[in-house]
Curated annotation (Swiss-Prot):
Record keywords, A-Z: ATP-binding, Cytoplasm, Ligase, Nucleotide-binding, Purine biosynthesis
GO CC terms, sorted: cytosol
Protein name as it appears in the record: Phosphoribosylformylglycinamidine cyclo-ligase
Species this chain originates from: Streptococcus agalactiae serotype III (strain NEM316)
Domain of life, source organism: Bacteria
Pathway(s): Purine metabolism; IMP biosynthesis via de novo pathway; 5-amino-1-(5-phospho-D-ribosyl)imidazole from N(2)-formyl-N(1)-(5-phospho-D-ribosyl)glycinamide: step 2/2
Primary localization: cytoplasm
Molecular function terms, GO-annotated: ATP binding; phosphoribosylamine-glycine ligase activity; phosphoribosylformylglycinamidine cyclo-ligase activity
GO BP annotation list: 'de novo' IMP biosynthetic process; adenine biosynthetic process
Gene label: purM
Amino acid sequence: MSEKNAYAKSGVDVEAGYEVVERIKKHVARTERAGVMGALGGFGGMFDLSQTGVKEPVLISGTDGVGTKLMLAIKYDKHDTIGQDCVAMCVNDIIAAGAEPLYFLDYVATGKNEPAKLEQVVAGVAEGCVQAGAALIGGETAEMPGMYGEDDYDLAGFAVGVAEKSQIIDGSKVKEGDILLGLASSGIHSNGYSLVRRVFADYTGDEVLPELEGKQLKDVLLEPTRIYVKAALPLIKEELVNGIAHITGGGFIENVPRMFADDLAAEIDEDKVPVLPIFKALEKYGDIKHEEMFEIFNMGVGLMLAVSPENVNRVKELLDEPVYEIGRIIKKADASVVIK
């Protein structure tokens, strides 16, 4: 019995793995950017940092996955956008520290290697990289029968970016009186899906709920996470932003305080938060307490900026989209986030 046949009998299809590599090459090529060295398939991805033109470069990295949103992608057999979610979760974190994304690596683990499906996943990763300006310089696809079911897969990503040392955003510049500006989310993004799946466990996904403005439930639930790089990067370059919070797991309550010192707090005007219909539906059908919604979800604001009052107009000029003045930074009395 040949080694190939022995491996195949154990559930690993080497030929399918080779096919995946061939299928994804055209998608990876879309992400090419200055600084990339070498070709896909090497033992390590290479990047020439000198090509960035940054004088005092500081590398900033992030890693994340998409949680149980993957289970809905599998349930609805829609795999072409979940990769964008993975990229977004990573690059939105590092842009919050002031980094321009340079490159990205992905990791896909599955119970059965299905080349057509995995191509869709990686195509989504590539689309996310294009939106973020990051090169997809490497990755790993692992077929692990026995670890995962045949239809199951998991996805994780790793982003590396660069910032000028003087432009790092670490919360030290946020001060009392700063204005809090919110940038709209595209939907739930990629957190809170264990609760989302429980709320809609008995739904097929084809439903058009009255709150969802004519959209099918499954399309709203799988709406890809917005990538904020192109919106935020010009603001960082002009040093117009004192703090940035990526609103992910933990909602407003956990994420907003991550962008300022312990003696400060955020005062949020709830009436100015552009709450999306899906959050109203979740609160209603899930019988979730209103205040708890802000502890779990982004509620319609995926990125929050702390900006000096004198810079607010310039920030709005640079952002080609609605910008929501949702609050301000105050001295902390008790809670780190006060929603009024």
